[in-house]
């Protein structure tokens, strides 16, 4: 079977039922994969930072996903499998040629839930100053996230926006779990510093409290 951007042989893939017709395959894809389009577009937009590139990336991802869908094992994590294809397609096709980030309305990015989801693991961002950051508009959080190095940005995105556990992030990013944990820790630390600066500038944080935990 052809390599679907590095996902062949990974968890979730095995020879599919040979008796499945093309019509049945299409129906299964539409039933299981299409409902995840909005979430995948959010991931594509985080990667490319440009709506036109995000749409192109999503389209290419879904074409590849459909091509390999007959071998996807029903009952395993389809979302993680699709994100793996999305990530590898971005790395292989878009990272080197992507357009410059464009200005676009904040409502196009509605999936950012870092403040409310930061507690999902023991290394989450929850702290006194982060409580105040919940008052920040999404555009400030978006800009802070985009300021992170790519490998940190994507680790934070997958963990705190999409809610993937370490193991699945490691599969998506094709990197060891220890590396994922390190990138996530460092990314969250940098993001907390960036957001604390914004909060202090906007008057949300008070004096020395805003510096606790972010000055080192």
Swiss-Prot record:
Q: Which GO terms describe its molecular function?
A: DNA binding; sigma factor activity
Q: Which GO terms describe its biological process?
A: cellular response to heat; DNA-templated transcription initiation; regulation of DNA-templated transcription; response to heat; response to nitrosative stress; response to oxidative stress
Please give one Pfam family short name: Sigma70_r4_2
**Annotated spans, Disordered:** 1-24
Q: Where is this region: Sigma-70 factor domain-4?
A: 140-191
Tell me, how does this one assemble?
Answer: Interacts transiently with the RNA polymerase catalytic core formed by RpoA, RpoB, RpoC and RpoZ (2 alpha, 1 beta, 1 beta' and 1 omega subunit) to form the RNA polymerase holoenzyme that can initiate transcription. Interacts (affinity=15 nM) 1:1 (via sigma-70 factor domain-4) with RshA under reducing conditions; the complex is disrupted as temperatures rise. Phosphorylation of RshA decreases its interaction with SigH, leading to increased SigH-mediated transcription.
Its biological purpose: Sigma factors are initiation factors that promote the attachment of RNA polymerase to specific initiation sites and are then released. Extracytoplasmic function (ECF) sigma factors are held in an inactive form by a cognate anti-sigma factor (RshA) until released. This sigma factor is involved in heat shock and oxidative stress responses; it positively regulates the expression of itself, sigE, sigB and a number of transcriptional regulators as well as other effectors of heat and oxidative stress, leading to direct and indirect control of up to 25% of the bacterial genome.
Q: What else is known?
A: Was identified as a high-confidence drug target.
Q: Output this protein's name.
A: ECF RNA polymerase sigma factor SigH
Q: What is the lineage of its organism?
A: Bacteria, Bacillati, Actinomycetota, Actinomycetes, Mycobacteriales
Q: Which gene encodes it?
A: sigH
């Amino acid at each position: 079977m052809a390599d679907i951007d590095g996902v062949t042989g990974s968890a979730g893939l095995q020879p599919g039922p040979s008796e499945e017709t093309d019509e049945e395959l299409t129906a299964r894809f539409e039933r299981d994969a299409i409902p995840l389009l909005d979430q995948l577009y959010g991931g594509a937009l985080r990667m490319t930072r440009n709506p036109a590139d995000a749409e192109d990336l999503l389209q290419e991802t879904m074409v590849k996903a459909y091509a390999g869908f007959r071998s996807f094992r029903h009952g395993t994590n389809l979302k993680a499998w699709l994100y793996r294809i999305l990530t590898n397609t971005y790395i292989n096709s878009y990272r080197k040629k992507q357009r410059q980030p464009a200005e676009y309305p904040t409502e196009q990015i509605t999936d950012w839930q870092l403040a409310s989801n930061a507690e999902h693991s023991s290394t989450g961002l929850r702290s006194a100053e982060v409580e105040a950051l919940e008052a920040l508009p999404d555009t400030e959080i978006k800009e802070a996230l985009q300021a992170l190095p790519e490998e940190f940005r994507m680790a934070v995105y997958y963990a705190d926006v999409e809610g993937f556990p370490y193991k699945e992030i490691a599969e998506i990013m094709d990197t060891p779990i220890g590396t994922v944990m390190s990138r996530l820790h460092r990314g969250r630390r940098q993001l907390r510093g960036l957001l604390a600066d914004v909060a202090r500038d906007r008057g949300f944080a008070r004096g020395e409290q805003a510096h606790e935990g972010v000055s080192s």
